[in-house]
Amino acid sequence: MRRLILLMATMALAILMASGVAQAIINGEPDGNMHPYVGALVTEVEGEDGQTEPVLLCSGTLISPTVFLTAGHCTEFLIQEDLPTYVSFDTTFVPGQSELVSGTPYLHPDYCVGCGPPGVKWLPGYDVGVVVLDEPVEMETYGTLPSANLVDTLQKRSPLTVVGYGANDFATGGGAQQPIYPDSRQMATTEYLGTQGIANQVGEDVFMKTTGSGMGQGGEGTCYGDSGGPLFLDDQTTVVAVTSFGPTSAIPCSGPDYAQRVDLQVVLEWVSSFL
């Protein structure tokens, strides 16, 4: 809860949270070392005691020794607020103990909040960003970019794996439900539902829709803190999309989920320019 209060102190992130942006894994399972190239995007903010402390902001995927792929609304926040940027690949992020790698955040040039169709103006178009790390992180395997327009070939109900460091449950009783953040890498299985619906700007299928957790109904999906995390194909390395947002409702993180497609040519070209 402390982290949420600190981050929501800025108007920018408060607007994103109110819109349902910035998603965590519900009803999933610990990832362990299944996807070691999925990391936590971390920054530093001033705490209630006036001291600077590291906080976990979003999730993402290392696609080369120095390029970390995440959501645009995550890097936009860091850029606008001129905050320090770090990435951790520890299975569980522990403030003050986890190893951090510093980097520079970048935002897709076509990213735009307020450019959505009527009724969903807050929708973040081209919600993709990268962090270029100051030092290379060597791993045996990295996440990989998809081929162009791969999502268009997926069959409805195709299984996808979502991974992230976000909330995995909610504390109930005594008022509004409060998210519980384990700050650990988790994974879950979701299903592809298509590219049509609230998540698309007029004439552009820039997002893909997946089954959400159906909070309280046993489904698996994303929630606060999973933003920027990958949606993997069966090979567990191909990032077809990054978690973007879920519609607001009386029950938080109840799905469906929406993810920014990475397979679009305009996205692939921009991300590849950093490789």
Q: Language model features by range: what are they?
A:
Residues M1-L4:
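Positively charged n-region of N-terminal signal peptides that target proteins for export
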Residues I26-N33, T52, E76, E81-M139, ...:
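Conserved catalytic-core segment of clan PA serine endopeptidases
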Residues E46-P65, L123:
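A conserved glycine-rich beta-strand in the N-terminal activation segment of trypsin-fold
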Residues P124-V128, V132-G219, D257, L264-L268:
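Chymotrypsin/trypsin-fold serine protease catalytic domain
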Residues V45-G47, F68, C74-E76, C112, ...:
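Solvent-exposed loop/turn segments at secondary-structure junctions
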Residues M8-M17:
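Bacterial N-terminal signal peptides
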Residues A22-Q51:
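N-terminal activation segment of mature serine protease catalytic domains
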Residues D31, L56-I79, L83-F89, Y181-I198, ...:
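C-terminal subregion of chymotrypsin/trypsin-like serine protease catalytic domains
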